[in-house]
């Protein structure tokens, strides 16, 4: 990679960091978290050099502010993408079952997921309390849902959370 390419890459993640600080789309708690790392370029780079991507195990990442972190913004983006797909398929009336584990932010992420799907006219079945993956799997089949979402990072360390779609 040339020096010029490195500078361009650096500009991209710094530009995204600045966008999150200045945009009215992000709440004060998020902005304060980002302000606390303003002098740590490596941390800024790690949080913004890429967006979380779906892998074989869904989305997984450290909880925190940034495009490369699990937070209400990345969960919202993933959920809206799934909603768009469900609407394209015309299966919104079948619904989506949603479950979560005991990790930090799991309940909040699952509630947000249900609200976004509902706002798109998609029926949801949100468990009232934490449930294991096999119970979600059973619910998807029993209720004949078009999809199931599990908020969990499985075996990853406690600072992680995840978003799995079935």
Task: Indicate where each model-derived feature is located.
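Low-complexity, intrinsically disordered short peptide segments enriched in small/polar/basic residues
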Residues: 1-4, 119
